[in-house]
Amino acid sequence: MQQTTLAAEASYTGIGLHSGREVHMVLKPAPADTGLVFVRTDLEGQPQIHATASNVTSTMRATTVEENGCKVFTIEHLMSAFHALRIDNCYIEIDAEEPPVADGSSLAFFQKMKDAGVKELAAERKEIVIDNVYRIDDEEHNRFVMVLPYDGFRVSFTSVNPHKLIGVQYENFEISPELYEREIAPARTIAYEQEIEALRNMGLGLGGTLESVIVYNDEGWINPLHFEDELVRHKILDVIGDLRLAGPIRGHVIAVASGHALNTSLAKKLQASLG
């Protein structure tokens, strides 16, 4: 199997979920062995930040990568689309520290990439082929994420939410570009109304609106769902994005209540062992 890049440029302008700032993003084709590389066009010298697990520096409500003192955060939705569409190499030019949130899902990014087209390159693709059981646990909160050998890419996820409106949700998908676009990419970020003010006081969620976040309270959902189990589908979207920081995965991911911290810890373990 050959490495890939985009066949043409793709661009998107929008608001950052946490920063609340307008950002213009351009996805550009890149040669083999480049990887997925952010280019901060708003900074002097246009520094590059490689989207790899070893560059993860924070997982507070989003995944952050940092290189030589320059960072980009909330990258997981974009990484998820790259992973699902099997794009190995791309320059991501961005004029702020956070990609646009779009509607809180990865669908806009996936469709932009799909419309640009995927181009094969001469070099062989380097997959992270799972050869053993790799697992990260958070025993205190009864959470874990693991990956097993499997000839393909499958994700089985159980989300556990104490709110009666959501409760326990489970989904299990064999990941292909077609299934991802239909069943996972439209799943949006979810927030509890009572948490929003606290997040904003922390400088987070400043760009979140009912156009980009699903909000619920003790009475019910404030805006309509795309899926009855949209929370667990968005969790699957996130883990696909976070694990792409290790490389394209060939294996079966199984997770219970996992978030960015556990996901990226597993990505670091995979990168160190198999990358």
Located regions from the model:
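C-terminal regulatory domains involved in ligand/effector binding and gene-expression control
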Residues: 1-88, 93-275
